[in-house]
């Protein structure tokens, strides 16, 4: 059975179709073309509560003032362990004890990608300072979902003990 071809669109239909925004299909190479960072996070637990830090303003609106576990980018030649000690000292003037690895997640943001690796940590004896964050909270596991997390850190919640 022969099928008739669809009628050609009228000029009016063509004009209206030109204004429709078509979503670009997912292309796995898009992530490969972005800058990629290895990032580590300290999941600090004290008396059953998790330390959550609120980010400062950023050039990237999608992470500005969102919540995260403290940490930072792994520099060339650094181990994850050394990076955590350095970043927490720089951002909080605090010494921590780095424990076991909880796992890693990959997060693609509009401008870059990260592999985020979390470690279970214990805080040092003295109090920390807010040198690079707006605020902090100690929260029980069941309270964590209520925060406005960065997308990468939100994925880490599934790895928490």
Model-derived features: positions:
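Methionine residue identity
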Residues: 1-3
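Low-acidity, Ser/Thr- and Arg-rich intrinsically disordered low-complexity segments
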Residues: 5, 10, 14-16
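Short, Lys/Arg-enriched N-terminal segments with co-localized hydrophobic residues
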Residues: 14-30
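Conserved N-terminal beta-strand and adjoining loop/helix that marks the start
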Residues: 30-51, 73
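Active-site-adjacent beta-strand/loop module that shapes the phosphate/pyrophosphate-binding cleft
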Residues: 46, 95, 104-127, 135-137, ...
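Conserved Nudix-box catalytic region and its N-terminal flanking loop in Nudix hydrolases
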Residues: 49-90
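Short secondary-structure junctions
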Residues: 91-98
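NUDIX/MutT-family hydrolases
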Residues: 120, 128-160
């Amino acid at each position: 059975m022969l099928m008739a071809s669809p009628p050609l669109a009228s000029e009016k239909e063509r004009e209206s179709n030109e204004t429709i925004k078509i979503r670009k299909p997912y292309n796995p190479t898009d992530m490969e073309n972005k800058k990629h960072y290895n990032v580590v996070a300290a999941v600090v637990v004290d008396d059953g509560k998790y330390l959550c830090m609120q980010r400062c303003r950023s050039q990237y609106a999608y992470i500005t003032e969102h919540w995260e576990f403290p940490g930072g980018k792994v520099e060339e030649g650094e181990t994850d362990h050394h990076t955590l000690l350095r970043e927490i000292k720089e951002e909080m003037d605090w010494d921590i004890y780095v424990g076991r690895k909880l796992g890693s997640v990959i997060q693609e943001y509009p401008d870059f990608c990260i592999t985020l690796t979390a470690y279970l940590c214990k805080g040092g004896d003295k109090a920390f300072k807010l040198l690079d964050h707006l605020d902090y909270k100690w929260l029980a596991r069941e309270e964590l979902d209520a925060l406005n997390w960065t997308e990468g850190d939100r994925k880490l919640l599934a790895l928490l003990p």
